[in-house]
From Swiss-Prot:
Transmembrane segments: 23-43, 44-64, 77-99, 120-140, 198-218, 222-242, 252-272, 285-305, 306-326
One GO cellular component term: plasma membrane
Biological function: Part of a membrane-bound complex that couples electron transfer with translocation of ions across the membrane.
Cofactor requirement: FMN
Family named by the database record: Belongs to the NqrB/RnfD family.
Name of protein: Ion-translocating oxidoreductase complex subunit D
Organism: Pseudomonas aeruginosa (strain ATCC 15692 / DSM 22644 / CIP 104116 / JCM 14847 / LMG 12228 / 1C / PRS 101 / PAO1)
Top-rank taxon: Bacteria
Modified residues (FMN phosphoryl threonine): T172
Amino acid sequence: MALPRPTSPHARGSNRTPAIMRLVLGACVPGLLTLTWLYGPGTLLNLAWASLVALACEAAMLALRKRPPGVFLKDGSALVTALLLAVALPPYAPWWLTLVATFFALVFGKHLYGGLGQNPFNPAMLGYVVALVSFPLEMTRWPSPDSALGLPDSLREFLGLATRPDAWAHATALDVLKTDRSLTVDELFAGNPAFGHLGSAGSEWVNLAFLLGGLFLLWRRLFTWHAPLGMLAGLFAMSLLFWNGSGSDSHGSPLFHLFSGATMLGAFFIVTDPVSGATSNRGRLVFGLGVGVLTYVIRAWGGYPDGVAFAVLLMNLAAPTIDYYTRPRTYGHRKAERGFKAGD
């Protein structure tokens, strides 16, 4: 008599790629709404255009690689990349700048290495850095929060049909702190409209919004606390170490750096990338610390006011080495074994 031999059931998890991407998109909504409230609908135009370009690039690359477009287009990863670029680019970036950044992010940052799960660099940060290095003037045209445009003017800016005076775009607080050494930090906060209560005017509210969205993702356990805390701790420690009060040669207080630029966006939505970052918990902590330290170094002494994107890409290069030296202990062994043995 033949006995039935059924296989054991497989455990099914709810963390499928489309569900994860939807949660990330939802967590970015507070930051997106805050940007729209402060700077007008330009960010929404960037998002709509970047999403169309991202889906088109995704479909074209899938067709070239002979992969089923319908399956991969539904996973939402291209839309997440588009959203991260839309909130990182200036609100009134011209259409071609968003096109270039999104194209490089999807084609060279993602599909050149084999698609989702194979990319060694964060695609959104790669596209952003390409745009920043290639078109620095357009990438630094941030308006002040009190000069937001309406939808018709935003469309003209987006299409490149409007000419604004140079005074319309102002330097951010990170720009001013890097270039203006004639005033103390207290004088800059008191007399320069680029500065807010904690950090850059407007940027502090955007950072608080992304902090709220990031804490939601942490509560949903989409990532562990190691990478975000590592980045914030590294940035805080460096800014505290080199902060000399409010002198004219100061690089800003720890709170200023935590709530300026793309700090919270980077801490909760960029360094937590499970593909291009480290994999072990200790490795994620080291990875985040490296991003935080490099962000401060670039802000204080580098050629760019904000260094989050460059710091992430540099640490992406170091991620395999970090994984090698922070490999967790295998069950049954006293310590983790590294490298290959003879005959393997």
